[in-house]
Amino acid sequence: MRKSMGITVFGCEQDEANAFRTLSPDFHIIPTLISDAISADNAKLAAGNQCISVGHKSEVSEATILALRKVGVKYISTRSIGCNHIDTTAAERMGISVGTVAYSPDSVADYALMLMLMAIRGAKSTIHAVAQQNFRLDCVRGKELRDMTVGVIGTGHIGQAVVKRLRGFGCRVLAYDNSRKIEADYVQLDELLKNSDIVTLHVPLCADTRHLIGQRQIGEMKQGAFLINTGRGALVDTGSLVEALGSGKLGGAALDVLEGEDQFVYTDCSQKVLDHPFLSQLLRMPNVIITPHTAYYTERVLRDTTEKTIRNCLNFERSLQHE
């Protein structure tokens, strides 16, 4: 009989816990499920397991990594595509490997298309009016994608999936990326901004892309253009965005991510007063759609992320056996 391997899963939400419990027997693993995010204080809960899993909102600092090393952890698998939340330099220095999971880009691509359609059809205003039993057509006349040019910034897996979907709508598609990864009409960023009716962001956040869309870039965009962001909040200078929306320079925005969202995303804040410089303004704007960083979140992605996390840990354990 194969010996079961243990994995300590930190920051484990109820739906993730159910997925781990369902899949664990198939892989002969024993998960220790902990709802609290990983920290230097609770790292000791991983004692006895060489592999742990963390969520993408868990900040894994140097102090936390040191605490993990002390209890014998050798591998951190984050349940996310990126690992900006982990001090990978400290992990490498302490001999702890870090792994990520890649999931299907379709969930985010579908969501980005949904947000585009909602934005250009004025869905927020329409839904609000109907909720008030106002069924008039005042100010609800929308636009059609086939009549528009869409600029896709970033043509990695998600950007490529977005381009593929847009072609089905018959609209013109422009693309910008540091490398040409697909057959597409690639242009420089300033040309994309000047010629796109919709701009959608699909690049990772790093020093070079922080505030990629700032005051100057917004100034280059077409009058009445729409901005869609399902990437990372800090890709956009939110202050400049709010100013452009208020002045009418931009026709609208649909944001699944927002700069400074860490204080409220994935939390019921209905009874709280949030100290965010722009959230309340954006929520009041009839042409702005805000959603809670949920573009990726589907049943398929939950299962895929859980399964790939388990496989990452199993593969790491096997690699140790062959050293």
Curated annotation (Swiss-Prot):
Top-level taxon of origin: Bacteria
Name recorded for this polypeptide: D-specific alpha-keto acid dehydrogenase
Organism from which the protein derives: Enterococcus faecalis (strain ATCC 700802 / V583)
Role: Required for high-level resistance to glycopeptides antibiotics. Catalyzes the reduction of 2-keto acids to 2-D-hydroxy acids that give rise to peptidoglycan precursors that terminate in the depsipeptide D-alanine-2-lactate rather than the dipeptide D-alanine-D-alanine thus preventing vancomycin binding.
Gene3D superfamilies linked to this entry: NAD(P)-binding Rossmann-like Domain
EC top class, as a word: oxidoreductase
Family the entry assigns: Belongs to the D-isomer specific 2-hydroxyacid dehydrogenase family.
BP terms from Gene Ontology: cell wall organization; response to antibiotic
UniProt GO MF annotations: D-lactate dehydrogenase activity; NAD binding
Active site: R232, E261, H293
